Design a protein with these regions (language model features):
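Extracytoplasmic
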Residues: 2-5, 15-79
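Conserved beta3-strand ATP-binding lysine motif
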Residues: 12
Length: 79
């Protein structure tokens, strides 16, 4: 299998775009922070994610920064 995986950090997910954009703006100093819209269980979900990262070291650094800022729900996503 030659599939390349991408590493993302998901900070949070919201049912409304406004909340997602507020969080995105709060952490605008982080490069590559975006809101990703997905349709799940009959509704739109807005995921605030950072990435993709080229290295696990960089992802770890951003993850630790977010945890230190109180974002305890932050998690790694590998796709």
């Amino acid at each position: 299998n030659n599939k390349k995986f991408k590493i993302w950090i998901q900070i949070a997910a919201f049912s409304n775009i406004k909340s997602a954009k507020i969080l995105q703006d709060k952490f605008k100093e982080i490069q590559n922070i975006n809101v990703h819209k997905v349709f799940l269980k009959g509704r739109n979900i807005y995921r605030v994610r950072v990435g993709p990262f080229l290295s696990i070291d960089k992802a770890d650094s951003v993850y630790n920064f977010l945890i230190a800022k109180g974002m305890q729900g932050t998690k790694f996503i590998v796709e």
